[in-house]
A protein has these predicted regions:
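Short cysteine clusters
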Residues: 77-83, 87, 146-152, 156, ...
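Iron-sulfur-cluster electron-transfer modules
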Residues: 58, 64-74, 104, 108-326, ...
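Cofactor-cradling patches in redox/metallo enzymes
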Residues: 159, 243-333, 377-388, 392-399, ...
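Iron-sulfur (Fe-S) cluster-binding segments and ferredoxin-like electron-carrier domains
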Residues: 85-113, 154-173, 381-384, 424-438, ...
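Extracytoplasmic substrate-binding proteins
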Residues: 174, 295, 325-333, 347-363
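Short hydrophobic beta-strand segments
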Residues: 233-243, 366-377, 458
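Ferredoxin-type iron-sulfur electron-transfer modules and their immediate structural context
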Residues: 1-142
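C-terminal amphipathic alpha-helical segment
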Residues: 343, 349-398
Length: 499
């Protein structure tokens, strides 16, 4: 059990309650501010610049001109209220500034003041405000209480994307010298060493060698975990969490078993040993592109034919939606395969071809449900049919175990609730927010558990898996009840002479 918290933990009940509005319940919550070294490594000022108000207003204008969608989102809200009870952070904290419309308004009120005629001449009439230190403080607090999950945009009749507003606000804050330590420090590690953990090549090689020994000892089969192998067919780009921690590492073992049994040559790159791209979270195109280009460089250097992403939600969004724009064209890869592919797509295709033999009885000790990760569910897809991001993972799970049960329909698929730790919030300085933000998913898990006695919840996102490992004990679940989809695959896979 985790250390007793210094905050009230929401209680699970028979159904998810919409809380009564309580002002400023999370006004104390904010992440650590980035140090000078973390800011400057990303091309941002090391501290708050002297003329920060003018710099921020100018940056806001630049972003609305550059990203027309952002301007539409700031102009088009009609205050219908459809989004108010859709945010997991509002449901878990009751703070009205965690309603999506109120979160948007923190930026919208400044936009109106400086970039609309009504706001310039009649600010009080249209809710426009000057950019002051108090407003900047609210930005820093509440734009770091948004996991950019985009659930609110599903229910907005105008499709307003609060995630885009949040990203813009964070980019403005970085530009004036007030960035978030957690995200910016991690991006700096990727720029320097190629992964979020700051693992150098020797440490990565030692880790993979140890995994080979562990798998051979357990199975009697030599399953390779290749590193920097030139001429391999597949470049696997996976979250660095897969290299060091449970339950992630069991997913990596599952990938390796799949590649081994299918007879696919593959490799990891020490230059691009990270699928995650936190540049997305801070709204920085330049930093997002710099991270993505490492993947292109590795693919060219190693001469691979395919790029496959591991189990990471936002990494798959960047890969599926933006990789070609950021780092393309990828005309040097095999045109027979999409660029990139998700490991679930690869495994699903191999199962359909009959190239993998699975024994679902190997997982008969498990009764499994599945958490749809936000960036997979609402910002990408899989396969060649609409909704593949929902069906493919479930079909892979059902091929690997006999006891699978979905959570309630309003909490999965396109309507899935966030884990509570995405969007650059997976840091212990925001643990209260993370625990409270997990409430809707924990309620859904309780509901399916009450009916079907669930033992495990599977996910295909490194952030989700890390988040649930942390918050499960707060709600009476065991931290080891969260597992990787490819742990199920790996445990069910019958190893032998590969094809």
């Amino acid at each position: 059990m985790a250390k007793p918290p210094e905050f009230d933990i929401p209680e699970l009940s028979d159904f998810l309650n919409v809380p009564t509005v309580t002002e400023d319940t999370m006004a104390h919550s904010q992440p650590y501010v980035a140090k000078e070294v973390h800011q400057e490594a990303l091309g941002f000022p090391g501290e708050l610049v002297d003329d920060w108000q003018n710099v921020a207003v100018a940056k806001l204008g630049e972003l609305t001109r550059k990203y027309r969608g952002l301007q539409v989102y700031l102009d088009s809200c009609v205050k219908c209220g459809a989004c108010t009870d859709k945010c997991h952070y509002y449901l878990g904290t009751s703070d009205p500034k965690n309603m999506p419309v109120a979160r948007q308004d923190l930026l919208r009120q400044v936009y109106r003041r400086y970039y609309t005629v009504a706001g310039k001449y009649f600010p009080k009439l249209v809710g426009a405000k000057d950019l002051t230190e108090d407003v900047l403080d609210d930005w820093y607090k509440y734009y770091h209480q948004c996991s950019q999950c985009r659930r609110c945009s599903v229910y907005c009749p105008y499709g307003i994307d609060t995630a885009e507003v949040s990203m813009a606000a964070r980019e403005i804050m970085d530009t004036v010298g007030k960035g978030q330590k957690y995200c910016n420090e991690i991006i700096g590690k990727v720029h320097k060493l190629g992964n979020n953990l700051g693992l150098p090549e020797p440490a990565l090689a030692d880790t993979l060698e140890g995994l080979e020994e562990d798998v051979e000892e357990e199975t009697g089969v030599t399953v390779r975990f290749p590193l920097d192998v030139k001429g391999a067919d597949v470049l696997l780009v996976t979250p660095s969490a897969d290299f060091f921690a449970e339950p992630h590492i069991d997913g990596l073992i599952g990938y390796a078993k799949v590649f081994h049994q299918a007879g696919l040559s593959w490799t990891i790159s020490s230059h691009a040993s990270e699928a995650a791209n936190f540049g997305l979270f801070i709204g920085s195109y330049d930093n997002m592109q710099k991270v993505a280009l490492r993947i292109r460089e590795a693919a060219l250097e190693l001469g691979v034919k395919r790029i496959v992403f591991g189990e990471c939600g936002h990494a798959w969004r960047v890969g599926y939606s933006f990789l070609n724009t950021l780092a393309g064209p990828f005309d040097f890869l095999d045109p027979a395969y999409p660029v990139p592919q998700h490991i679930v797509e690869v495994t699903h295709d191999l199962i359909q071809q009959g190239r993998l033999k699975l024994d679902p009885e190997a997982n008969d000790d498990k009764r499994v449900t599945f958490h749809d990760s936000c960036n997979v569910a609402r910002a990408s897809r899989m396969g060649d049919k609409a909704g593949g991001q929902f069906t493919l993972p479930r079909e892979v799970i059902q091929a690997s175990c006999n006891h699978f049960f979905d959570m309630p329909s309003g909490t999965i698929g396109e309507a899935t609730f966030c884990c509570g730790g995405g969007g650059g919030l997976l840091t212990d300085d925001l643990v209260e927010l993370r625990v409270k933000g997990a409430l809707p998913r924990m309620q859904a898990l309780k509901d399916v558990n009450d009916q079907h006695q669930i033992t495990h919840m599977a996910a295909i996102c490194a952030i989700c898996k890390s988040q649930f490992s942390k918050v499960f004990p707060y709600y009476g679940f065991r931290m080891d009840q969260i597992i990787s989809v490819h742990q199920l695959v790996g445990d069910a896979l019958v190893l032998g002479n590969n094809h």
